């Protein structure tokens, strides 16, 4: 019997996910942009998944943008917010323990003339809230932090971070990389003051190659991909119906009886330690 302990890297898909992925690949295979029956059937899977995911966070369905995964979501949050808001300023704040899909785009933005402040973390992986407050300026347009670190497991106090940001500069956007948090924590972007939030499907027993970016209604952000105008013009390209459908199935499973699942994980952790 194989015991797999690398679920922070990726997860095995659930049977319910596998079933809906196969069904959308072999039976309901239409292009969701098509106006005939097969297309409308495919589009319904996307609508259903978007509703499921929006409901898990108590946000509007139109605030969920499907992507090819966490890296694209992070890239769009950073580049899209920077390009759309650069008239207000060109200063961005992040931390020293971000994923390469955040850290590397910040390097590119620096090459393009943006100023990036990288905050250090303590030995537990947490940023100093005092240093964050001191770093925020009138021209700070974006702060980007992880929710849960993928290597050391540090959990950042995102709601406290947001309060500091909005108190110092209400127009500064707050992006959260929640790729290791979604499915494990109850996430409420509205309550927690999060403007942009990245998630990946394969971290929650869904398919690889699909994710989403939560974009709070009213946030100014530009697309990364231009073309046929899918997803209200924010992310062109024919949608990955099997991936999105599988993502929705995984999200539904993760947040059904969520408290009981979390308690079981805590018991297993305590047993192993």
Model-found features: residue ranges?
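Pyridoxal 5′-phosphate
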Residues: 1-273
């Amino acid at each position: 019997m194989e015991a797999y302990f690398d679920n922070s890297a990726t997860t095995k898909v659930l049977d319910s996910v596998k079933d809906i992925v196969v069904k959308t690949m072999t039976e309901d295979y239409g292009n969701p942009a098509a106006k005939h029956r097969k297309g409308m059937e495919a589009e319904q899977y996307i609508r259903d998944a978007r509703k499921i995911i929006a409901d898990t966070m108590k946000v509007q369905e139109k605030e969920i943008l499907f992507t090819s995964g966490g890296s694209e979501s992070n890239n769009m949050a950073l580049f899209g917010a920077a390009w759309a808001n650069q008239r207000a300023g060109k200063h961005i704040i992040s931390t020293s323990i971000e994923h390469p899909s955040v850290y590397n785009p910040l390097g590119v933005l620096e090459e393009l003339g943006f100023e990036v402040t990288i905050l250090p973390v303590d030995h537990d992986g947490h940023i100093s809230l005092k240093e964050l407050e001191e770093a925020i300026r009138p021209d700070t347009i974006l702060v980007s932090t992880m929710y849960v670190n993928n290597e050391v497991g540090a959990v950042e106090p995102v709601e406290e971070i947001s309060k500091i940001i909005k108190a110092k500069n209400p127009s500064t956007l707050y992006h959260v990389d929640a790729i290791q948090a979604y499915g494990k924590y109850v996430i409420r972007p509205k309550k927690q003051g999060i403007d942009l939030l990245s998630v990946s499907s394969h971290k929650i027993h869904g398919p690889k190659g699909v994710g989403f970016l939560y974009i709070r209604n009213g946030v100014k952000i530009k697309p990364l991909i231009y073309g046929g105008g899918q997803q209200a013009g924010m992310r062109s390209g024919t949608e990955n119906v099997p991936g999105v459908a599988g993502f929705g199935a995984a999200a539904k499973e993760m947040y059904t009886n969520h408290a009981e699942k979390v308690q079981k994980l805590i018991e297993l952790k305590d047993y192993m330690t």
